[in-house]
Amino acid sequence: EPGNMAYLDFAGSTYSGSLKPFMMARCINIRKALELLPVPQNVSGEAVLLITDRFLPLNNGLLKITAQNGALTQASTIENEEITMDSAAFTQLYFGTFSFEELVRAEKIKVHNPQKSGFLQALFNKCRNYINEYY
């Protein structure tokens, strides 16, 4: 079926295909990554994200992100979460490996407020990454 991303969970299976990426990424500081995210001028909105990170507690927390006039601000908040994801899903979203909707369908992101989906879809674009390494 088109869009079926079940293969993302098959890494430990004996009878499945395997993915062998040549590059891996991880957002070490999610708050700083959000500060550096380029935002299109026409994207505006806000959402409260609950980010969880099993390995780096610095990244755990509720963040309210606001985009307007080509800038993104983020701040810790005590508001109810509207979107929940772990650091792995955030990294895939941030680098454009998968779109917001693809990660929702794969159950990597949980949406508590569907009205925020359009904003996050516009903020994080799926793209092809070209990585150059120079030694």
What do these predicted regions represent?
Residues 1-135:
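Intrinsically disordered, low-complexity, positively biased terminal segments
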